[in-house]
Amino acid sequence: MSSINLSSSSPSTISLSRSRLSQSSTTLLHGLHRVTLPSNHPLSTFSIKTNTGKVKAAVISREDDLLSFTNGNTPLSNGSLIDDRTEEPLEADSVSLGTLAADSAPAPANGFVAEDDDFELDLPTPGFSSIPEAIEDIRQGKLVVVVDDEDRENEGDLVMAAQLATPEAMAFIVRHGTGIVCVSMKEDDLERLHLPLMVNQKENEEKLSTAFTVTVDAKHGTTTGVSARDRATTILSLASRDSKPEDFNRPGHIFPLKYREGGVLKRAGHTEASVDLTVLAGLDPVGVLCEIVDDDGSMARLPKLREFAAENNLKVVSIADLIRYRRKRDKLVERASAARIPTMWGPFTAYCYRSILDGIEHIAMVKGEIGDGQDILVRVHSECLTGDIFGSARCDCGNQLALSMQQIEATGRGVLVYLRGHEGRGIGLGHKLRAYNLQDAGRDTVEANEELGLPVDSREYGIGAQIIRDLGVRTMKLMTNNPAKYVGLKGYGLAIVGRVPLLSLITKENKRYLETKRTKMGHMYGLKFKGDVVEKIESESES
């Protein structure tokens, strides 16, 4: 995760000339200025006349607040605020929900400071080996320890490629595992070998709905089927493309499992991880897996798994890292259709993208020609039915959506990607409403999710990144306040050359929500440096 680090600027006093009315402004940080504009005005943007022409700018909120100006920390000397509609000097405050694309600065200068390595999805979670290292060991016929999420089974499995199984490997697995040796296989291979599920999925009462088939032993080359050599023989037979249904006795001592198509991207289980690793290693899609037990026979947890792996020179990888690895490389969406759509902000071209994994349809609103794909203004917006459609005042989602479209229209070129399935930061509409009830009872948005046993933010941006790339974007100015989104998109190889903040108006209804996002989730709703505090979040709008 990237760190939040705001560099400091020395304040300087400058003057805004506005039709015989001079107002003072303090230069703050990278195009943000504290400014006093005494009255109200319906505009959300205005222009500043300079010696070199006219540039767009915006005032955030109301009196004594923030003005955003494209020239970074350059003082606005001899500039005039111009009403864009009348070309006349502006005599009133200009209220905006954010800044224009021209107001962006290089991303590190805007507070999202992270080492380049922080964006590399191939880097393992601290304390784990990398996925490429595990893939190489699988390719060589070695065992790997695969660990799932602590909120799932929180267990580790010994995993290897089935086609490389040996009696020695089986003896090691049986000695350190539960003794229940499983072989994960794709549906086509199970059907070819006539291996039906033990119970249909509707009747499956196993905690994680693991899809067990009938058990088997190889008919040829085995005795009782239980020895390490017999089990290796059975596993090699299951992995063989030449095997036939009549080559197996039923029941037996090996437990075939049905792999979920899509692998760990559809189900974050050891069954799927074992096949995914063998496929990534260039081997046949059949994996061996067995749960590791502690010395007392209980399931081994992560500290013991690390100790065990170190003693036996085994790599330990997490399914979460495997998911990230695959999302970076697999094709996740396909373009379905496109049409021109006139909007309240102006004409856009809408592109529908369909998820290959789950069929969810997403939309990209494109303004102008992407051309060489350089320096494109981009907003990746997560679906929020209550805010975007019904205008809920609990959040600032609808305001950010409208502001993003407005800014893209004003810029004349840009992309807004609307990701569905992100409702409530990924928890879904029903859970979001339950969380609202807890918030009404005193919890904040983070505490409410945690009390419901749900992740604070489970959104993933691989689909958005692939849509952006498919549209031809190569470098972008990202409209966001969220460092997780910045890192999430950067991790998919997209070059982010600037960040454009989206600073929403504060209301009584959303103040606590925005404050929580700022203090607990790192959102950039306030700027603090060298004793001079600019905290929009602390000045509650009375409107």
Curated annotation (Swiss-Prot):
The keyword Nucleotide-binding applies. One of its GO terms (molecular function) is GTP cyclohydrolase II activity. It is found in: Plastid, Chloroplast. GO terms for cellular component: chloroplast; chloroplast stroma. Residues 57-328 are annotated as: DHBP synthase. Its cofactor is Mg(2+); Mn(2+); Zn(2+). Gene3D superfamilies: DHBP synthase, GTP cyclohydrolase II. Pfam families: DHBP_synthase, GTP_cyclohydro2. Expressed in leaves, shoots, roots, flowers and siliques. GO terms for biological process: riboflavin biosynthetic process. Involved in riboflavin biosynthesis. Catalyzes both the conversion of D-ribulose 5-phosphate to formate and 3,4-dihydroxy-2-butanone 4-phosphate and the conversion of GTP to 2,5-diamino-6-ribosylamino-4(3H)-pyrimidinone 5'-phosphate (DARP), formate and pyrophosphate. RIBA2 and RIBA3 together are not able to complement the loss of function of RIBA1. This is Bifunctional riboflavin biosynthesis protein RIBA 1, chloroplastic. It comes from Arabidopsis thaliana (Mouse-ear cress). The gene is RIBA1.
